[in-house]
Amino acid sequence: MAASALRGLAVAGGGESSESEDDCWEIGYLDRTSQKFKGQMLPIEEKKENFKKALTTGDVSLVQELLDSGISVDATFRYGWTPLMYAASVANAELVRVLLDRGANASFEKDKQTILITACSAHGSEEQILKCVELLLSRNADPNVACRRLMTPIMYAARDGHTQVVALLVAGGAEVNTQDENGYTALTWAARQGHKSIVLKLLELGANKMLQTKDGKLPSEIAKRNKHHEIFNLLSFTLNPLEGKLQQLTKEETICKILTTDSDRENDHIFSSYAAFGDLEVFLHGLGLEHMTDLLKERDITLRHLLTMREDEFTKNGFTSKDQQKILAALKELEVEEIQFGELSEEAKLEISGDEFLNFLLKLNKQCGHLITAVQNIITELPVNSQKIVLEWASPQNFTSVCEELVNNVEDLSEEVCNLKDLIQKLQNERENDPTHIPLRKEVSTWKSRILKRTAITVCGFGFLLFICKITFQRK
């Protein structure tokens, strides 16, 4: 039954078509006792047939016996696959080790299909794939050789969600920002498939999130198109504080870091290491002001407070004029405008004209519209459950209390606007009923005046047209 389960796994790496899977791989019971005594006497074709069956069933001891009987470790079966390539395709680390120890060529490739690519796209557990990749890298397999579609091993590992394999390949010299025939990088593949842990790891390893595909799409846009909104938000930040964190480590240090951490701890580390950076830290890192992080934390200054600071507050909290300019430029880029309602109140005086008062009301109405749009945008962007929150948040009670204050302020504003409306209506009624009031003369447009205006406009139009024509002819 184990052999039956393995039969469907012998597929060319990366989903590329290969007829090798139809290479007469018969699966059935092997009489180990008879094979042990008759191995030396079998003809070469029968030995190869038994070799294929042993590879299929993962029978390591029989593989060793057949190799001892004289069959080549790099024997090619029909369509060109070697035993090592087949062992890698089913992520059989023990079999890979035996074949490599017997001198199998780790750099073998068939039609641009390398053994390392086959291992990275294998159907198996990440633990077994990781061991196979480690063994192949130890025998100088090149992690940057691409297949016919220009996909490298790290792209296959990122596509299939193997975080530790990605990190190990980079430690082995894999290029993070290589692009395939469609312009996809490993980061683009991870974003497309929704592998958040891979995205975080690649950013940590120096992946460039601004590389576009051939159709001009960024990894963030690819994630959004495939409805991975959490990854879209993650890639839309100005700068990821983890970016390039492991680039300065040596190959040996990185391998040690990866292999001494079990998979559960590795996953915990990936998420916790990013969660340790709140929205304030991300904002400051993006502006190159990370030196202000500790100071602002000591003074309990949040990102919201920072974005609404006045000039004197910046100076009081130790920001230089250069730092202030960076923050103000970022606010302008993000289109975060501080609404100065204090200026509006100065216009509401008795001696203002009707036009000024109307402008005041229009401006107030426009600002309310902006606020409504801003709240609607926030509602649509917020994740639907707490597990999808990327950055560290403060206590939800802080948010709800502020929202309650906002509701009260909106109710007060509504009441005051109603009072203003009633007052304006009252003034209008009193003015209409005042016998001393002289109503404004309404301009009455007669048919004669309308004809005169149209005639004047037509004459001016023809005159302007003749003037243009005259200038054109003079130039010629």
From Swiss-Prot:
Disulfide bonds: none annotated. One of its GO terms (biological process) is spermatogenesis. Keywords: ANK repeat, Cytoplasm, Developmental protein, Differentiation, Meiosis, Phosphoprotein, Repeat, RNA-mediated gene silencing, Spermatogenesis. The modification Phosphoserine is found at S17, S18, S20. It is found in: Cytoplasm. Pfam families: Ank_2 (PF12796), Ank_4 (PF13637), SAM_2 (PF07647). It comes from the Eukaryota. Interacts with DDX4, PIWIL1, RANBP9 and TDRD1. Plays a central role during spermatogenesis by repressing transposable elements and preventing their mobilization, which is essential for the germline integrity. Acts via the piRNA metabolic process, which mediates the repression of transposable elements during meiosis by forming complexes composed of piRNAs and Piwi proteins and governs the methylation and subsequent repression of transposons. Its association with pi-bodies suggests a participation in the primary piRNAs metabolic process. It comes from Plecturocebus moloch. This is Ankyrin repeat, SAM and basic leucine zipper domain-containing protein 1. GO terms for cellular component: pi-body. ANK repeats lie at residues 46-75, 79-108, 111-145, 149-178, 182-211, 215-244. Residues 273-335 form the SAM domain.
